[in-house]
């Protein structure tokens, strides 16, 4: 039987919208923008399962709950992708690449994928503790989710070698809800889409300005060249007349 460790006192330590199962289970499930899948995951043996809508504080809460339970070694990301936030892809990017010095998730495509309250050390702990992230993004098949959870349990490597890491996210964030208490706040997927598109438009405007500047310089150069040529032609013609 795989070795187990005690999770942090009062686990899960970060509040949110989730269902808790056996804290000694090696599997945790994120159901992204879907609802009605969590009970199925718990019935299959998951330690915790719940949705996650935002690519900043929402992800932080998931990370904090995972690293405070060293028994969690597998992460299943399933359910419908959250438009604008693209939370599922952000989870994958975080697991594969970590965060930069500015707290940004490297390679994430969400609107504002920044870790305000979780630094590089907790992220590294998350990357080391989770042995596999199973990508089931956009799947809402309860049967497949349950089978995936069971497959992970059959490969349980035992608890992570280090004890639970506790991050006081509530104290830092100062809020209670998933999307409250952080200086980075997305009010809706629609706003995230707008902000993402605004950034794309801004880049396109910059590129257009560069092209326009080049074309303007090229055009001005042609005018100057014609003027100089005409002047020299008139000068030579005048000299010939003399």
From Swiss-Prot:
Transmembrane keyword on record: yes
InterPro entries, sorted: MeTrfase_MtrA/MtxA, MtrA
Localisation per UniProt entry: Cell membrane
Cofactor note: Binds 1 5-hydroxybenzimidazolylcobamide group.
Reaction(s) catalysed (UniProt annotation): 5-methyl-5,6,7,8-tetrahydromethanopterin + coenzyme M + 2 Na(+)(in) = 5,6,7,8-tetrahydromethanopterin + methyl-coenzyme M + 2 Na(+)(out)
GO biological-process terms attached to the record: methanogenesis, from carbon dioxide; methylation; one-carbon metabolic process
Topology versus the membrane: Single-pass membrane protein
Pathway: One-carbon metabolism; methanogenesis from CO(2); methyl-coenzyme M from 5,10-methylene-5,6,7,8-tetrahydromethanopterin: step 2/2
Keyword Repeat annotated: no
EC code(s) of this entry: 7.2.1.4
Main location: membrane
Subunit note: The complex is composed of 8 subunits; MtrA, MtrB, MtrC, MtrD, MtrE, MtrF, MtrG and MtrH.
Role according to the record: Part of a complex that catalyzes the formation of methyl-coenzyme M and tetrahydromethanopterin from coenzyme M and methyl-tetrahydromethanopterin. This is an energy-conserving, sodium-ion translocating step.
NCBIfam families with a match to the protein in the record: mtrA (TIGR01111), PRK00964.1-4 (NF002126)
Family per similarity comment: Belongs to the MtrA family.
The protein's name in its UniProt record: Tetrahydromethanopterin S-methyltransferase subunit A
Gene that encodes the chain: mtrA
